[in-house]
């Protein structure tokens, strides 16, 4: 059986906040204090994932970021995956902080967010949004083969095993 792959919200928030605190002066000079303060003060919703009989697996996105969570969960399920990079939600300020500091948001701590494998991804996304996870998104699906692919546009690349974790 194949499953849809969802994310409960924007990734890399915790890691980007840690970087912003460490490099606040540099970032404020580039983006302004109000912009960086907003990025630092943003919080994930502190609510539970709704119970759904069609959910196969839920994994927190922590050390190693979404890439590590995808790798580990595919290994646990014994499946491959196809994930659209463009469908993974990331706040714009997180991208800018990461670009400025040469960090990768896809390998960054996203504590508070979850990867969810569900039979009916669209229905589960709607349940998540109704429960307060406004940025929940369907990002891909599992495959019968063992290939773990990240797709962006016409380009496909293999997901690599997690190495040393970042932020």
Please identify what each model-predicted range represents.
Residues 35-110:
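Active-site-proximal betaalpha loop/short-helix elements
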Residues 6-10, 109, 117, 140:
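Short beta-strand segments
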Residues 117-123:
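Helix N-cap motif at beta-to-alpha junctions
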Residues 21-25, 71-78, 98-101, 126-135:
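Short, solvent-exposed amphipathic alpha-helical segments in soluble enzyme
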Residues 1-38:
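Phosphate/diphosphate-binding glycine-rich loops and adjacent basic-rich segments that engage nucleotide
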């Amino acid at each position: 059986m194949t499953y849809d792959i969802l994310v409960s919200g924007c990734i890399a928030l915790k890691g980007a906040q840690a970087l912003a605190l460490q490099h606040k002066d540099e970032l404020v000079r580039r983006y302004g204090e109000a912009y960086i303060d907003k990025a630092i003060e943003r919080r994930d919703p502190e609510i539970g994932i709704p119970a759904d009989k069609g959910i196969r697996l839920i994994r927190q996105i922590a050390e190693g970021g979404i890439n590590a969570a995808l790798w580990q969960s595919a290994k646990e399920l014994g499946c491959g995956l196809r994930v659209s990079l463009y469908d993974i939600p990331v706040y714009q300020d997180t991208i800018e902080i990461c670009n400025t500091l040469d960090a990768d948001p896809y390998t960054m701590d996203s504590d508070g967010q979850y990867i969810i494998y569900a039979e009916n991804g669209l229905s589960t996304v709607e349940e998540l949004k109704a429960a307060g996870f406004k940025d929940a998104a369907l990002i891909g699906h599992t495959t019968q083969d063992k290939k773990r692919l990240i797709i962006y546009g016409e380009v496909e690349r293999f997901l690599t095993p997690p190495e040393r974790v970042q932020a």
